[in-house]
């Protein structure tokens, strides 16, 4: 699993779709 910031790990509970989008952005960087 990709290591995320603690703040984002908390957010993913409420925005799982945003997490998927965020992971795609991170992979492109």
UniProtKB/Swiss-Prot annotation:
Protein name per Swiss-Prot or TrEMBL: Prolamin alpha-1
